[in-house]
Amino acid sequence: MHKLIFVTGKVGSGKDTLVKIFKDLYSFEPFFYGDNLKTVLLYAGWNGKKDLKGRKLLQQVGRAFRNYDEDFWVNWLFDDICMYIDILDYFSNNDIRIIIGDVRHINEITRMKKIFTEKYGPTKFITIKMIGPNRDPNREMDKETTEDISETEIDQYKDIDYTIINNETVNIKDLHSMVKIIYEKEFQDS
């Protein structure tokens, strides 16, 4: 059975670290909605910095495309995933293991589940929410960027399978242990 993990959380909560652990331990292929947005902006001359000015640009342009078509970023990432799967299928007949590491909007889960299942059939989906209070105080955020819909909408999504509190007491070993527990519970027999 195919496996697809959605990871959500605020800036600095540890999403990228969690994705890396799933990749390293269980060969999940990471994908990020933000990669395509960053590609568009780099092509347009953005310097790639995620300072306050850069974050505002990411949020504003991302929102502009979502206003044009709510599923714009979902459909683009799905196309990227399909291309990866086509290559994977060509070389092997392994199960598909995907992890999307930067879910910020509800449709990024619901729409992806729908179109993925339509194309690839039965799939085990899980959603992990990372909560990292005060995890990275060096991030440049202001009230506007902190309260942007890209930082707040996902809080309304209630179908979270696992919540990881990634505070000052959690170290990398702890995260590895949590990932192992989740994997064994959700995927060991599939």
Regions found by a protein language model. Give the residues of each.
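Post-Walker A helix-loop "phosphate-sensing" segment adjacent to the P-loop in P-loop NTPases
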Residues: 24-31
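Small-molecule kinase domains that catalyze NTP-dependent phosphoryl transfer to phosphate-bearing small molecules
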Residues: 122-190
